[in-house]
Amino acid sequence: ELLDNEGFIEEALYDEESNIAKRFMPNVNYFSRYIGSNGNRYQPQKLLNNSTILLLGLGGGVSNILTLLAGLGPKKIIIIDYDNVEEGNLGRQLLYTEEDIGKPKAEAAAHAIAKINSNIIIEPYNKKIIRPEDVLEHVSGVDLVICAIDEPPFIAQRIVNKAIVTAKVPCVFGASQVSRGRVFTVIPGVTGCFDCMNLHYSMRDPQFNEQFIAFRNIEFSPPTIAYAPAIYQLTAAIVDEAVRVITRYAEPRSLGTQYEINFEDGSSFTHPTWPRYADECPTCGNGDIDKWEIFKYYEDKK
């Protein structure tokens, strides 16, 4: 029992009905380390193979998320992005080739993934997310959303947050901040949402609103700062978090908190958690948006 509790004993019976493709057996063997002797080591992979994932955004190094998902084998991936492939993308968005320059990212990505795993249903959409309805149009039947939209900062995340709360679909959010990356996960009705995080920080930090205004008013557009090995650390964490939410092979690390990765030294930690404000939040609860100053600044920026 002690060895089993410590994960040294695995369920090793061969399941002839598992119907797991050989390409996924290394995944199964990995998951079995966490399942233990009483579980079904095939179950996490089966859940992945039957899942539908909506990926929002292919900028930065996010196309690498799509590559990792292809190796995990979800049944269907819906991808949405409005940009075209540029030469400057090729140093970190390694799904694309020189032949893709000038093509819509969503279409080029779908073509590339079809070559990696032809069994995945890929639905590409060349569109920009500017309101929650743009997400809700595609969320029916989706098991998990991954939000990697980086523009406009914070506003894009709030738009997606409204949509996933309305649809009651979990979402893993990820963003890069030059030398660091952050991941946080929202499960509607279970964790606090993105607006709960805004409420939490504005209630506890007297300077939060002021700092947000200062950031919002910056007119300078910095050059793209993205280094592929660093971005891979972030995208791997995002995808693993998505797998944890879908399969529960292990507990997700970013539920109601920000999981931060330091690209320079490889360390990681979780920020203090924020709760779900069911009575105060105007998005996932019963709160009045007009009572909270922070949301006024979001509206002013639109």
Question: Where are the model-predicted features located?
Answer:
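N-terminal charged helix/coil linker that caps or initiates catalytic domains
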Residues: 1-53, 299-302
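Short, well-ordered alpha-helices that flank and scaffold nucleotide-derived cofactor binding pockets
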Residues: 67, 71, 111, 198, ...
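Glycine-rich phosphate-binding loop and adjoining beta1-alpha1-beta2 segment
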Residues: 76-117
